[in-house]
Amino acid sequence: ELSLTTFPSYKESINDWVNGQRFTLKQLMIYDRLNNETLKEIISEVEQRFGANDSSDKAFDELFKLIFTKLYDEKISADDADAISNQMRYGNKSLKEIDDRQFRTLEFRAKEQERADDVYKNISDLYERAKKKWPGVFPSNSKLEMQKATVKSCVKELQNVKLFNSNLEVVDEAFEQLVNKGQKGDMGQYFTPRYVIDMCVKMLNPSPDEKMIDTAAGSCGFPMHTIFHSWNILNPNKDNLFTTAKRTQREEDYVKDNVFGLDFSEKSVRVGRMLNIVAGDG
């Protein structure tokens, strides 16, 4: 189901018209599954679809690649996110009233009638672009190492989920579900609730000219919320949480020069590195 962007022409078949409907960031916000479901539930469904065709041993790495790619697809629609925010804030428009005809079409999609080979190629190409945009999370020669049918079924589950939201809780839910719980328990790891992190950061009240290091950073909750806190000081009237909004050079420099995190878990390091790179845009 989509909010209509065009009407069919008199020469156009219904099937051609349906297939030609664009899915933009506006559509994603309207039909976001997180309006009615939790990400843990959705990720659990994705894991089941993955396990139906592929080995569960590589579920974390492969689903991590898909989430990484999905975040990239949302991030490169940053101009559209800014337009939506401005029109809703200053133009007093509702989301459905916003004209999205000039918006970018999202690419992390899989239509029901689309061949699995075509979906795999499209998502693989998007993944390659994401790696070039955000190097250091995955090896440059890494590929999607799952069945093509698995890619299609997992993309269908994730495509109507808006991962960039006002806080890290949404993405944290995804990775908490994916990270091997047995391994976490053996090493005494856990995910600190975000409201606890928010409280601690507000109590410490870090300033943009201070440096911080977390020597057991895990998925980088404390470093990320320190970043958000300092960004809010640098630009108090700007959206400063986990959004697709563009960052100023000063904000990016603060992340690169002042915030550091360490951890002995390879999985946690990769998750934390990705969140820092994505939220700080490099």
PLM regions and their residue ranges:
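Conserved S-adenosyl-L-methionine
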Residues: 186-282
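Short, hydrophobic/amphipathic alpha-helical patches that form generic packing surfaces
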Residues: 61-74, 274-278
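Long recognition/docking surfaces used for binding and targeting
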Residues: 68-180
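Residue-level detector of well-ordered alpha-helical segments, enriched
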Residues: 58-63, 67, 150, 170, ...
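Short, polar/flexible loop-turn hinges at active-site or ligand-entry regions and domain interfaces
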Residues: 50-55, 77-82, 185
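Short, basic/polar, glycine-containing "phosphate-handling" surface segments that engage DNA
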Residues: 1-58, 149-165
